[in-house]
Swiss-Prot record:
Component of the A-type ATP synthase that produces ATP from ADP in the presence of a proton gradient across the membrane. The A chain is the catalytic subunit. The lineage of its organism: Archaea, Methanobacteriati, Thermoplasmatota, Thermoplasmata, Thermoplasmatales. This is A-type ATP synthase subunit A. SUPFAM superfamilies: C-terminal domain of alpha and beta subunits of F1 ATP synthase (SSF47917), Hedgehog/intein (Hint) domain (SSF51294), N-terminal domain of alpha and beta subunits of F1 ATP synthase (SSF50615), P-loop containing nucleoside triphosphate hydrolases (SSF52540). The keyword ATP-binding applies. Keywords: ATP synthesis, ATP-binding, Autocatalytic cleavage, Cell membrane, Hydrogen ion transport, Ion transport, Membrane, Nucleotide-binding, Protein splicing, Translocase, Transport. GO terms for biological process: intein-mediated protein splicing; proton motive force-driven plasma membrane ATP synthesis. Has multiple subunits with at least A(3), B(3), C, D, E, F, H, I and proteolipid K(x). Its main location: membrane. It is an enzyme of class 7 (translocase). The intein interrupts the ATP-binding site. It comes from the Archaea. Its EC number is 7.1.2.2.
């Protein structure tokens, strides 16, 4: 048995560890802390410890388990919440309370729970590695397939059915003169990639339902994508804006000052912005559908803005907001979101009014949704403090302003997990702040799978490894997550793995490397950073699996990077971009303009576009690629023309260039912009995306023809068909085709009036 001779944070040096091998798991000290051998010199072993080493002393024992760091694989993984080394956090909470006691190592899978095993083979059949022996209904959404472990083949001499625990023997296989007992549970070393028969080219897209991703920057099943980390959630209202709480009205600026002084709250500070995560949520009111309901806010945002818009209404209501902040405007029978700078006199905006009803004994006061007409709008320039409340679970709005106006708030989350057509989602919170992980752990279990109505957790595994946990466990969490993903891929499922954030993992590598006194590379990161990042992303892919039957599965890896100050030239971002083929560039400026998803179409890219072209042409339309290229061309041209417009002014520009700016605005606002909280707009099928894009390009074509015939953009900008196009995003899937046909007919008719009778007839 070895003994400790040196301790440096999470790094421990021991000597005379019995039978020491690289990456063996050891138990360190009297408390039996879990560690892993990462370096051997003579009789000295260097160990990275996955738990806090405070209080450990030299000469304490080190015991070698003689096995590598492994995960348990079997029924019960789904719906679980693990830490970085697959310890179930719900079990630990029962044992040690809110904090993880050191030395605890409960089993990852419940040993007592019984699962209904349904055999898929019979006694006497010959089986091979990867073959499915039987199935277990793990959750309402996922059937768990029990496979023959690697290295085992032969005749089935016993196969069980009925209810069994994960450690029970459910089959016996005889081959090569040996008899093998097979349990429902198996283990696998996390650093070793699971074998596949062959990798396949990325030819099928991971459909997310998000138009900016599916249409412009698609990711393939089995592909890799990089996303920069979180940023400011956007600016909203001035500090003197009243917010309606359950205890009455309070100025949002006062609420922020009280919150930032409360030591129980967590404060995050960025450049010209602060977010206070509230220990005690604010009880407020929000608009959900056509009702005003009680809601809660878990955070307050403070930032700066160089302009404020004051909006006043007929009945004396008033609010001061940033120009890009959206108000809810009534158009016909529907309510749409419109930036305050674009709200006009005469528009009716959503408000709340107090309704009292009852008899002389009891009076019940309720809030009801109403609309008030705008009578004036003023723009003020200068530097203003602005604030926002985060209300993620109640339509992202709150009631405030002088006179109870519905105020918008939007932060998009969980869309890929909720809407992508992956069967399994593995989310790794690697080194994120505890409050952020808490928000995910509390909101994820409440989300519903939109296709089945079942809880999203029924197909999800969460791995939580917060920033105050030992840094060594961050690296382990990445490997734990990808190994679990590979296991479900081997069953034939499509898995989406989200690692948030790989930058925190790289920081852990840097700290361990520093403790080992290794030669630092760029910015202090170890020289092998690029290799480690590549090893992780290389475990993604779509593959023909090891099995006698033809079975396919995929792992799509989406890694978030959190570069300091948003500088993607730093080593972690550059090494990530080198091995990933999709980059979704999140843009704080777009978020501030309330454009969500805030993926910048000029800075983002996808290298899968050509690989997926034939799939889109075959399964959606042969015009798909041409429409996409034209949309990208218009958006690129818009960025060039905006500089010209700023120099010479919009009115001095040629009509054709005005048209490009106009169509680009339609693409941005009516196609790329998408509401995560609108029941219809949250998910957009590929067919609907195609018809929306085609309708926009139809306007582009006919607008150019009308301009050639002498029309001006002033004539065309007020056509009624343009408003009908902007409403297409909220048309239900079942009605979208007939809506599109009517829309195109109206485009031909209204623009035909400007083209001239001859041209109109020719084009029709």
């Amino acid at each position: 048995m070895g003994k400790i001779i040196r301790i440096s944070g999470p790094v421990v040096v021991a000597e005379d560890v019995e039978d020491a091998k690289m990456y063996d798991v050891v138990k360190v000290g009297e408390m039996g802390l879990i560690g892993e051998i990462i370096k051997i010199e003579g009789n000295r072993s260097t160990i990275q410890v996955y738990e806090d080493t405070a209080g450990i002393r030299p000469d304490e024992k080190v015991e070698n388990t003689r096995r590598p760091l492994s995960v348990e694989l079997g029924p019960g993984i789904l719906k679980s919440i693990y830490d970085g080394i697959q310890r179930p956090l719900d079990v630990i909470k029962i044992t040690s309370g809110d904090f993880i006691a050191r030395g605890l190592n409960p089993p990852a899978l419940d040993r007592q729970k019984k699962w209904e095993f349904v055999p898929a083979v019979k006694k006497g059949e010959t089986v091979f590695p990867g073959q499915i022996l039987g199935t277990v209904q793990e959750t309402s959404l996922i059937t768990h397939r029990i496979m023959v472990p690697e290295g085992i083949s032969g005749k089935v001499t016993m196969i069980a059915d009925g209810e069994h625990r994960v450690e029970d023997v459910i089959a016996t296989v005889s081959g090569n003169g040996k008899s093998y007992d097979i349990q429902m549970m198996t283990t696998w070393p996390v650093r070793k990639a699971r074998r596949v028969q062959r990798k396949l080219p990325p030819e099928i897209p991971l459909v997310t339902g998000q138009r900016v991703i599916d249409a412009l920057f698609p990711v393939a099943k089995g592909g890799t994508a990089a996303v920069p980390g979180p940023f400011g959630s956007g600016k909203c209202v001035s500090g003197d804006t009243p917010v309606l709480l359950d205890a009455g009205e309070r100025r949002i600026g006062d609420l922020f000052m009280e919150a930032i002084q409360d030591q129980k709250n967590a404060v995050e500070i960025g450049q010209n912005e602060e977010i206070v995560r509230l220990h005690d949520p604010l009880r407020i009111y929000s608009m959900v559908g056509s009702e005003i309901v009680e809601s809660v806010s878990h955070a307050i945002y403070h930032g700066k803005s160089n302009a404020i818009v004051t909006v006043r209404t007929e009945n004396g209501r008033e609010v001061r907001v940033t120009p890009v902040h959206k108000l809810f405007v009534k158009i016909g029978n529907s309510v749409i979101e419109r930036p305050a700078s674009e709200v006009n006199e005469g528009d009716e905006i959503a408000c709340a009014s107090v309704s009292e009803n009852g008899d002389s004994q009891t009076v019940t006061t309720t809030l009801v949704l109403t609309f008030d007409r705008v009578v004036s709008k003023e723009m003020h320039s200068g530097v203003f403090d602005v604030y926002d409340l985060m209300v993620p679970d109640y339509g992202y709005n709150f009631i405030g302003g002088n006179g109870l106006i519905v105020l918008h708030n939007t932060v998009i989350q969980h869309q890929l997990a909720k809407w992508s057509d992956a069967n399994i989602v593995v989310y790794i919170g690697c080194g994120e702040r505890g409050n952020e992980m808490t928000e995910i752990l509390t909101t994820f279990p409440e989300l519903k799978d939109p296709n089945t109505g079942q809880p999203l957790m029924d197909r999800t595994v969460l791995i939580a490894n917060t920033s105050n946990m030992p840094v060594a466990a961050r690296e382990a969490s990445i490997y734990t997550g990808i190994t679990i993903a590979e296991y479900y891929r081997d069953m034939g499922y499509d898995v989406a793995l989200m690692a948030d954030s790989t930058s925190r993992w790289a920081e852990a590598l840097r700290e361990i490397s520093g403790r080992l006194e290794e030669m630092p590379g760029e910015e202090g990161y170890p020289a092998y950073l690029g290799r480690r990042v590549s090893e992780f992303y290389e475990r993604s892919g779509r593959a023909r699996l090891v099995s006698p039957d033809e079975r396919y599965g995929s792992i799509t890896v989406i890694g978030a990077v959190s570069p300091p100050g948003g500088d993607i030239s730093e080593p972690v971002s550059q090494n990530t971009l080198r091995v990933t083929r999709v980059f979704w560039a999140l843009d704080a400026a777009l978020a501030n303009r309330r454009h969500f998803p805030s993926i910048n179409w000029l800075n983002s890219y996808s290298l899968y576009t050509e690989d997926l072209r034939s799939w889109y042409d075959k399964n959606v339309s042969s015009e798909w690629s041409a429409l996409r290229e034209r949309a990208m061309e218009i958006l690129q041209r818009e960025s060039e023309l905006q500089e010209v417009a700023q120099l010479v002014g919009y009115d001095a520009m040629p009509e054709k260039e005005k048209s490009i700016l106009d169509v680009a605005r339609i693409i941005r606002e009516d196609f790329l912009q998408q509401s995560a909280f609108d029941e219809i707009d949250a998910y957009c099928s590929l067919k609907k995306q195609y018809l929306m894009l085609k309708a926009i390009m139809e306007i582009d074509t006919y607008q150019n023809k009308a301009l050639d015939s002498g029309a001006t953009m002033d004539n065309l900008a007020s056509l009624a068909v343009r408003e009908k196009l902007s409403r297409m995003k909220i048309v239900p899937e079942a009605q979208v085709e007939s809506y599109y046909n009517d829309l195109v007919e109206e485009i031909h008719k209204e623009y035909g009036n400007f083209i001239g009778e001859k041209n109109a007839e020719a084009s029709l």
